[in-house]
C-alpha cells in the first residue's frame, strides 16, 4: 500500500504554519497559567494509582510540547526524551516553559516552504508533511493541560480561566 499523497502547496504550508503558530502562542499563555497554579507542596498529588503525579504530568506537558516543536524543526521524531534535567520547582517550570516554547516555535518559523511540505516519519507509525505535526503539538498540550487542570482544585489550588471563566477566575468579557 502506498503512502497517501497530500495536495499541499508550499504557499499553503507557510500560511498554515503562521496560523498554527499564532494559536500555539495563545495556548502558551494558558498553559503557563495552569502550570503555575500547581501548589508547590502538592506536586506529588495523584488522583488515582494509575495516574501520573501532578509534577510528572506537568513536566511531561511542558517538556514534550517543546520537544515536539524541536523535532518538527529538526524534521525527525525520536522517542528518547530530549530534556533530562527537570526544573526544581513550580515557578522554575513555568519559567522554563515560557523560555523554551517560544524559542522552539521560532525554529519552526525558520523552516522553508519546501521543508514544511517534506514528509517525516512519526515514530515509525506513519508519515506526513512536517507542517501537519503542529496540530499534534496543540492537541497534546490541550489534552494534558486539561488533565492537569482537573488536579488543581483537589490540590487546594484555583483553576485559572482557560477558554472562558472558571469558578475561581470568572470571565471578564
What is each stretch, according to the model?
Residues 2-3, 7, 21-35, 42-83, ...:
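Short, contiguous alpha-helical
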Residues 9-18:
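Short, low-complexity N-terminal intrinsically disordered segments enriched in polar/charged residues
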Residues 20, 24, 90-97, 101, ...:
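Hydrophobic packing residues in well-ordered alpha-helices of helical domains and bundles
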Residues 38-41, 109-111:
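Short, solvent-exposed, charged loop/turn and helix-capping segments
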Residues 70-111:
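Helix-adjacent hinge/juxtasegments
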Residues 109-124:
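Acidic catalytic patch
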Amino acid at each position: 500500500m502506498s503512502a497517501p499523497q497530500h495536495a499541499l502547496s508550499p504557499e499553503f504550508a507557510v500560511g498554515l504554519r503562521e496560523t498554527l503558530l499564532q494559536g500555539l502562542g495563545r495556548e502558551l499563555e494558558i498553559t503557563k497559567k495552569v502550570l503555575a497554579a500547581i501548589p508547590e507542596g502538592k506536586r506529588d498529588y495523584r488522583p488515582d494509582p494509575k495516574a501520573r503525579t501532578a509534577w510528572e504530568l506537568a513536566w511531561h506537558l511542558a517538556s514534550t510540547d517543546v520537544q515536539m516543536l524541536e523535532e518538527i524543526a529538526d524534521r525527525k521524531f525520536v522517542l528518547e526524551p530530549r530534556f533530562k534535567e527537570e526544573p526544581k520547582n513550580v515557578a522554575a517550570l513555568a519559567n522554563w516553559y515560557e523560555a523554551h516554547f517560544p524559542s522552539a516555535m521560532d525554529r519552526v518559523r525558520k523552516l522553508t516552504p519546501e521543508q514544511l511540505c517534506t514528509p517525516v516519519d512519526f515514530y515509525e507509525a506513519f508519515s506526513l508533511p512536517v507542517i501537519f505535526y503542529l496540530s499534534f503539538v496543540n492537541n497534546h498540550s490541550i489534552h494534558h493541560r486539561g488533565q492537569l487542570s482537573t488536579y488543581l482544585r483537589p490540590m487546594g489550588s484555583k483553576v485559572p480561566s482557560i477558554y472562558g471563566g472558571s469558578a475561581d477566575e470568572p470571565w471578564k468579557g
